[in-house]
């Protein structure tokens, strides 16, 4: 019995050696899980934990306003006010579009090395052209648009400008420069509207002056050709002359009747008769000149004279109205129609809210799990379909 014990012990030892060892949980993970979950999460952890650069956002708010008190303009002035200037609510979109435009970027380049701010700072994945593959100006413009954002509140009319960069001071500097450029744009819009308004008003005045000149020339020609300078005064003169001639005719007729009654053979009678005929002829001619049917009569000339005279007066009144509107337009245009009012100045952030490191790491892990689950389900479905 004692000789069989070593054999039994040896057999038991061999059996224990043949038992498989338990694998660690890491080794139990499938390669797919490593590829879709673990490796991306580790990369995200390393990048956001040690390499990702802080990004600072400077914020400011502004509003584009127009003066509340608008001077009242009549006639042409109201038309000029309507056509010369847009509402401030419309121009805010112009300012917003400009701040994200190539023109604004070009203006920033003249004031500061804005490309160096984004190309020479930050980690290789965050900065512009980190791998040296796309250094074109158009590529930088698209990068710039991602770093400048504007939100407009249509209820309050306030716009919020946000600028993000890798340095707090640089973000503040860019934000401040954009606000100043927006104010320059508003001034340019005001000046352009001012020039358009005054130019249009001046054109109206010039047109009215031409009408006055033309009407004045027509009136002068009529007066010279017809010998009439003041129809009413000239008519009064002629009527007065007729009245005097009629009075003289009455006197001559009275004398003639008296002489015939006293001395029918008086030698003065032929002279008085001749004088009577002359007066009657003169009165007849004067009456024809006033109301006769000839073209030269005052009655026929009165209608044409009145038309030419009224055209001249109307042209002068239109010129006076145009001059008044021009002065009103100049006074209105000299006032600043629109202005950019900064509500809050660009701040210098002392805390970087981007990148959100924990959120990005967790998001990478969750997305990896989702991808892993989808791939596993697809693989199982394919295997089941084959079987």
Swiss-Prot record:
- In Swiss-Prot or TrEMBL terms, this protein is called Capsule polysaccharide export inner-membrane protein CtrB
Q: Which positions, given as ranges, span the membrane?
A: 32-52, 358-378
Name the membrane topology term. Multi-pass membrane protein
Q: What does this protein do?
A: May form an ATP-driven capsule polysaccharide export apparatus, in association with the CtrC and CtrD proteins.
Subcellular location as annotated = Cell inner membrane
Domain of life according to the entry: Bacteria
Q: Name one GO biological process term.
A: polysaccharide transport
Q: Name one GO molecular function term.
A: carbohydrate:proton symporter activity
Under the cellular component aspect of Gene Ontology, which terms does the record hold? Gram-negative-bacterium-type cell wall; plasma membrane
Q: Which family does it belong to?
A: Belongs to the BexC/CtrB/KpsE family.
Identify the keywords attached in UniProt to this record, alphabetized: Capsule biogenesis/degradation, Cell inner membrane, Cell membrane, Membrane, Polysaccharide transport, Sugar transport, Transmembrane, Transmembrane helix, Transport
NCBIfam families named in the record: BexC_CtrB_KpsE
* Xref: InterPro entries: Bact_polysacc_biosynth/exp, BexC_CtrB_KpsE_VexD
């Amino acid at each position: 019995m004692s000789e069989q014990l070593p054999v039994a012990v040896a057999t038991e030892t061999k059996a224990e050696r043949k038992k498989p060892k338990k694998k660690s949980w890491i080794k139990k993970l499938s390669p797919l899980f490593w590829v879709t979950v673990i490796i991306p999460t580790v990369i995200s952890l390393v990048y956001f934990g040690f390499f990702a650069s802080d990004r600072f956002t400077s914020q400011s708010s502004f509003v584009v306003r127009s003066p509340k008190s608008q001077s009242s303009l009549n006639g042409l002035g109201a038309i000029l006010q309507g056509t010369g200037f847009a509402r401030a609510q419309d121009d805010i979109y112009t300012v917003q579009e400009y701040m994200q435009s190539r023109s604004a970027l070009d203006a920033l380049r003249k004031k500061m090395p804005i490309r160096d701010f984004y190309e020479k700072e930050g980690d290789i994945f965050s900065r512009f052209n980190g791998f040296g593959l796309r250094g074109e100006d158009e590529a930088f413009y698209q990068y710039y648009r991602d770093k400048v954002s504007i939100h407009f509140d249509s209820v309050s009319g306030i716009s919020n400008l946000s600028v993000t960069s890798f340095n707090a001071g640089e973000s503040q500097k860019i934000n401040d420069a954009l606000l100043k450029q927006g104010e320059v744009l508003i001034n340019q819009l005001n000046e352009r509207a001012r020039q358009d308004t005054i130019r249009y008003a001046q054109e109206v005045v010039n047109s009215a002056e031409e009408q006055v000149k033309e009407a004045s020339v027509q009136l002068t020609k009529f007066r010279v050709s017809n010998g009439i300078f003041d129809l009413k005064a000239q008519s009064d003169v002629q009527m007065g002359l007729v009245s005097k001639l009629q009075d003289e005719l009455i006197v001559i007729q009275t004398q003639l009747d008296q002489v015939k009654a006293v001395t029918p053979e008086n030698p003065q009678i032929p002279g008085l008769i001749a004088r009577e005929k002359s007066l009657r002829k003169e009165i007849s001619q004067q009456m024809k000149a006033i109301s006769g049917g000839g073209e030269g009569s005052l009655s026929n000339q009165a209608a044409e004279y009145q038309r030419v005279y009224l055209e001249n007066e109307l042209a002068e009144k239109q010129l006076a109205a145009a001059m008044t509107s021009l002065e009103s337009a100049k006074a209105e245009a000299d006032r600043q129609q629109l202005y950019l009012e900064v509500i809050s100045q660009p701040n210098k952030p002392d805390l970087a809210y981007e990148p959100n490191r924990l959120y990005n790491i967790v998001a990478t892990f969750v997305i990896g799990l989702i991808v892993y689950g989808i791939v596993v389900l697809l693989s199982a479905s394919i295997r089941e379909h084959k079987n």
